[in-house]
Amino acid sequence: PRMAAQECDCDFNTSGDTVFYNEYLEFYEQTYMKEPLEKRGVDKNLWVWESADYSRLYMVVADVARGDGKYYSAFHVIDIESNTQVAEYKGQIGTKEFGHLLVGIANEYNEALLVVENANIGWSTIQTILDRGYQNMYYSPKSDALNAESYFDKYQDKSKMVPGFTMSTRTRPMVIGKFAEYVSD
């Protein structure tokens, strides 16, 4: 049942079930969560635990929402070398404004690799990022090939790639499975 909502592309919050057991979530909350060093922005929804260290590599991973209603756009800044979350944002913001915010935070964190979900309204945010000329953006393969060789072959030729990360019924189980494997170790 825990994977059913995820595999059917359902909303975890409304399905009443999650991928991770509540005990695991509570353990991580009690063990690892700490107050941010800084809360930034008009809405104070940008939480920073570590400022950029210019000797480190970072990744900014973003999920785009419309900017109104009950859904929120969010991003996480990850130190790639230590696998540590150093900042996060969750807020109701327009898709274009979110693109500008992402470019700003990615530049602040050493021109971080910017990974934005490209489904539906994510395109508006991605277009803003591309219009700003941000260079270090993740591209997904256009095909459904699952092996690393096909990915790296295509990575050399952006005409075979699409900007952003494509979350789909094929990639979602892989992403969640890999994350579950990571946090359980």
Regions found by a protein language model. Name each.
Residues P1-F152, M161, T169, P173-G177, ...:
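RNase H-like, metal-dependent nuclease domains and their acidic two-metal-ion catalytic environment used
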